[in-house]
Swiss-Prot record:
A GO BP entry: heterocyst development
Protein name, as recorded: Heterocyst differentiation protein HetP
Note: In Nostoc filaments, approximately every 10th vegetative cell terminally differentiates into a heterocyst specialized for nitrogen fixation under nitrogen deficiency.
Cell cycle keyword on record: no
Lineage of the organism: Bacteria, Bacillati, Cyanobacteriota, Cyanophyceae, Nostocales
Cross-referenced InterPro entries: HetP-like
Length: 159
């Protein structure tokens, strides 16, 4: 599988802590589409290649005022905290981690007992009849009967 990556110039680009903060703020505000746009931008992709034109313009319009305010705050923060820039990119910014309250929450999920089957209605109906008979009829009566039918045997479906 060969993929053409000539159009992607920044595929190994890492986002900085301020950009990560913006994405987390958008997620915490419930603006998941805007968070996707930000992630695509920060990763070096053009969001227009992945999001419909009208949706992208609506997101830009909704978030343009918020972006201007955030940009001013970002510039003020950048000017006042020059020493903070030397922080390693591998460390998570503490400002966004403190906003996620259930970060340490862990729930162990057991193995699911139900399986997903294909869309064979005849087989499903046969299984339902067997399960019903197993629950409500005597086991002796079930073993003596042959329970197979087709959709054409069901009169109520044709009506």
């Amino acid at each position: 599988m060969n993929q053409n990556t000539t159009g992607i110039t920044n595929y190994n680009k890492a986002i900085n802590p301020q950009q990560f903060d913006k994405v987390v703020e958008a997620i915490l505000a419930g603006k998941y589409s805007w968070a996707c746009v930000l992630m695509l931008r920060f990763a070096g992709y053009n969001p227009m290649h992945y999001i419909p034109y009208r949706t992208y313009n609506r997101l830009l319009k909704e978030n343009s005022e918020a972006s201007k305010v955030q940009q001013q705050q970002h510039d003020n923060l950048k000017n006042s905290q020059v020493a903070a820039v030397s922080r390693s990119n591998t460390n998570m910014p503490s400002s966004c981690l403190s906003k996620i309250k259930d970060l340490a929450y862990l729930e162990v999920v057991g193995k699911q007992t139900t399986e997903i089957h294909g869309g064979n209605l005849d087989q499903w109906l046969t299984e339902q009849v067997h399960e019903f008979q197993d629950m409500y009829l005597e086991p002796q009566a079930i073993s003596n009967q042959d329970i197979t039918f087709k959709l054409s045997d069901l009169d109520f479906i044709h009506n």
